[in-house]
Amino acid sequence: MSTIEPIEYRRAGLCQWFTQSPGRSLLAVESYALRAVWPSLFSKVAVQLGCAGPVDLLEACNAQVRAVLDLPGVASTPVARVYGVPEQLPFDSRSVDIMLLPHTLEFADDPHQVLREVSRVLTPEGHVVILGFNPFSLW
């Protein structure tokens, strides 16, 4: 029997952590950094893969359409929600201008497949923004 928790529990645990003091502090820093990045990126469609707790990390993004893709039952932002898994994105090829991956790769069952899917749905001039923990830091 495997000791690895199903992705639903890991993602829900991360979303719960984002509601606590250390998680809120991290989200504040990440949100501030993204606000500086978004104005330089053109976007009609922006998609966030995975939960970032109660914070809308795409809020300052100038995209006409913004959505969050996450697992059913995982609490997320008030932005439009799409349910699915990052390893099988429910989007057409070359249909998304910006893909935001907030700690998505650390919690994915197959991070390489997530990146292949992101590459598939990204427009030719699209952008990928990856947020992640430094494995060599205290966090």
PLM region spans:
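Class I SAM-dependent methyltransferase Rossmann-like catalytic core
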Residues: 1-40
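Class I SAM-dependent methyltransferase SAM/SAH-binding core
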Residues: 32, 36-89
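A short acidic, Gly/Pro-enriched loop at the edge of an enzyme's catalytic core
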Residues: 87-99
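A short SAM/SAH-binding and catalytic strip from SAM-dependent methyltransferases
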Residues: 97-112
